[in-house]
A protein has these predicted regions:
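Short, acidic, metal-binding catalytic loop of nucleotide-sugar glycosyltransferases
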Residues: 44-54
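A conserved acidic beta->alpha catalytic loop
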Residues: 45, 61-69, 112-113
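Glycine-rich, basic loop-to-helix element that forms the pyrophosphate-binding segment
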Residues: 83-100, 165, 169
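Short aromatic/hydrophobic "clamp" motif used to bind/position activated sugar donors
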Residues: 105
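Conserved donor NDP-sugar-binding/catalytic core segment of glycosyltransferases
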Residues: 113-148, 218
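A recurrent flexible, glycine/aromatic-enriched loop bordering the glycosyltransferase active site
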Residues: 140-142, 156-179, 189, 195, ...
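Catalytic donor/gating beta->alpha subdomain of glycosyltransferases that bind UDP-sugars
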Residues: 187, 194-252
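Membrane-embedded multi-pass helical conduit in multi-pass membrane proteins
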Residues: 264-340
């Protein structure tokens, strides 16, 4: 699976040198493919972490063609290039943590920027509570002003602090929990973090979301097609993860998957019916459908008001929470079709060209 491991010395400034006395040390695993300058920005942010020693930065690259491995190597990271037939984020993360030397592993996506205080804050929490296996914080969009998609989807990253069922791709984890669970499921093209968290929780560990900044993220969604693909991938994740635990004593995401099917079907079928009816009875049926969608969006916006966005953005977020059910439904149906045909789904990518 790996096409070679290249080891590189850490910078002479000591940012990523051997752990200093009395300072906690962690390993950082960054994964990416064709992230370009986003990757450079990510690694540089790791080197600026406060209060903690970065023992090593391990960058696992999925056969980039934009020079990402060379960028990471120049910044002092250990670079591992993987070339699987079916690349997944899970493969990269597993390769990374298995090469790491520390008991605590900070996972990052290559398109993120680490908040300088998060690693130490998360370390403090884990060191004080042995029942926790993972700690994560707030991920927010770096450029919400770039598009309405970015501005609205920025709110999707916001979760209330406290114990949670799962985390995302940016998280500080105990190596012990990864060893006991054997890490991420490499067959999943999406949803690998919640799936792992489900198995971690079954071991008796907790997953904690703390109320502090963790990472900045760059969705870079500028077109409807990108939005559709991202939501389709989410639907595929719901279906594939819930299918894995469907017959277990502790099913996971089964209710979510069923609810997604119902909501997506409702909006899709009702839209078609309203359009067809409008051909015979004028615009009234379609206006009625729009009114129902608007009322549902207002209700969702009101429920999300704790996220602190402006009324206009909240209304768009409410609209998003319903319209995304269509591509989510499509993703779930895509999983079912692939399962019936016994055909593995390749990675669903929504980003455009890499940033050079």
């Amino acid at each position: 699976m790996t096409s070679g491991v290249r080891m590189h010395a850490m910078p002479e400034d000591g940012t990523c040198a051997i752990a200093e006395v009395n300072r906690p040390a962690i390993s950082v695993v960054v994964i990416g493919r064709n992230e370009g300058t986003r990757l450079v920005r990510c690694i540089e942010s790791v080197r600026q972490a406060h209060g903690i020693t970065i023992r090593e930065i391990i960058y696992v690259d999925s056969a980039s063609t934009d020079g990402s491995p060379e960028f990471a190597s120049h910044l002092g990271a250990t670079v591992i290039v993987v070339r699987p037939e079916r690349p997944t984020a899970a493969i990269g993360r597993n390769v990374g943590w298995r090469h790491a030397a520390s008991d605590l592993i900070l996972f990052l996506d290559g398109d993120t920027i680490l908040d300088p205080d998060f690693a130490f804050s998360a370390y403090e929490v884990l060191s004080q509570d042995v029942s926790l296996a993972a700690v994560w914080g707030h991920r927010r969009e770096i450029h919400p002003e770039t598009s309405l998609y970015n501005r609205v989807l920025d709110l999707d990253w916001m979760y209330r602090a406290g114990l949670s069922e799962f985390c995302g791709g940016d998280v500080l984890m105990r190596r012990d929990a990864l060893v006991k669970t054997r890490g991420f499921d490499e067959t999943l093209i999406a949803g690998e973090e919640p799936e792992l968290c489900r198995r971690i929780r079954n071991l008796g560990y907790g997953i904690l979301h703390i109320d502090c900044p963790m990472t900045g993220h760059d969705l870079e969604i500028l077109r409807w097609s990108q939005y559709w693909k991202r939501a389709t991938r989410a639907g595929y994740a719901y279906a594939s993860v819930s299918e894995k635990f469907r017959m277990s004593a502790d099913p996971f995401w089964t209710a979510d998957r069923r609810r997604n099917m119902m909501r997506g079907s409702f909006w899709g079928v009702s839209f078609i019916v309203s359009v067809v009816a409008s051909l015979w009875a004028g615009v009234l049926p379609f206006v009625l459908w729009l009114s129902i969608l608007l009322l549902a969006s207002i209700r969702s916006a009101w429920k999300a008001r704790w996220k602190g966005a402006s009324p206009g953005v909240l209304l768009l977020y409410g609209l998003h929470s319903h319209l995304q059910q269509l591509p989510i439904l499509f993703g779930q149906l895509q999983f079912q079709l692939g399962k019936r045909r016994k055909k593995a789904q390749r990675l669903i990518e929504y980003k455009g060209r890499p940033v050079a």
